[in-house]
Amino acid sequence: MNTLLFKRKGGNCGNESNIVSQGSPSSSNLPESPGTLDEKNLPRLPTPFARSLSTIPSYEQMKRTNKLPDYHLKIVVVGDGAVGKTCLLISYVQGTFPTDYIPTIFENYVTNIEGPNGQIIELALWDTAGQEEYSRLRPLSYTNADVLMVCYSVGSKTSLKNVEDLWFPEVKHFCPSTPIMLVGLKSDLYEADNLSDLVEPSSAESLAKRLGAFAHIQCSARLKENIDEVFETAIHTLLSDSLYAPREPTHTIKNPFKRNTTRSDIDSSTGDTSVSISGTKRLRKNKCIIM
């Protein structure tokens, strides 16, 4: 049920007789001859609603009560269906392991983490569908991606083969300059006895180097092993210069809808802006832009 903008304070608009008895002029009060009635002598109907203005906090109030993130990173996760992409994200964001498999079309998760010097980093994690029928919709997720995680399951050699045949060509086509890391999921399967059916770590490592991935990490969402390492590696690769650089005072332009930017970072020809720290400038240049 939608919240009403106006709250009812008194009166009864559902009972017509009640309204008439309280506010309608009786026959004894009517003038005996037709004429113009004096407005100030007319009785008034009771007001059934009284307006109540909602309290909307100003930007300055929100800034005082909630610290705005210093950085915003968008990470897009791709790979074959059922390799464990959703479990990876839920395990990282919520700390739980989902037991039921529900195919994902598109799903977004947002979480804030704290950097080594107290910086607030907002992560926007985009889960995508690996099924072929969604191949035309999937590129919509790549816009403004800062990191691409191409995933495979250690229990499926086919999913690793598709990394080379399908996923790297696709993300390289749409995001040629965006950093890509290779992530192996379900590493807890190595505890089983049928190791011959599993992906050999050395094969995945050599593939990552050959394809130009900046990192290759295997993890287990069920056991929560190496989950944090996956995302910390992505963050440090992008923001290592920014997170550990000393903060220098700068003259900033206040904008309530965007992160503060320095005047020297505004391109007069295009109006584009970038934050003043060198690491984030590099991040903007490598951001995926879908034309």
Swiss-Prot record:
UniProt motif (Effector region) ranges: 101-109
GO biological process: actin filament organization; maintenance of cell polarity; positive regulation of formin-nucleated actin cable assembly; regulation of actin cytoskeleton organization; regulation of formin-nucleated actin cable assembly; signal transduction; small GTPase-mediated signal transduction
InterPro entries: P-loop_NTPase (IPR027417), Small_GTP-bd (IPR005225), Small_GTPase (IPR001806), Small_GTPase_Rho (IPR003578)
Residue numbers of Phosphoserine PTMs: 264, 268, 276
SMART domains: RAB, RAN, RAS, RHO
Residues that hold GTP according to the record: 79-86, 127-131, 185-188
Bias type Polar residues, positions: 14-31
Protein task: Plays an important role in cell growth. Required to keep the uninucleated state. May be involved in the organization of the cytoskeleton which affects microtubule functions. Most likely RHO3 and RHO4 of S.cerevisiae regulate partially overlapping but different pathways.
Record's protein name: GTP-binding protein RHO4
Originating species: Saccharomyces cerevisiae (strain ATCC 204508 / S288c)
Lineage: Eukaryota, Fungi, Dikarya, Ascomycota, Saccharomycotina
Gene: RHO4
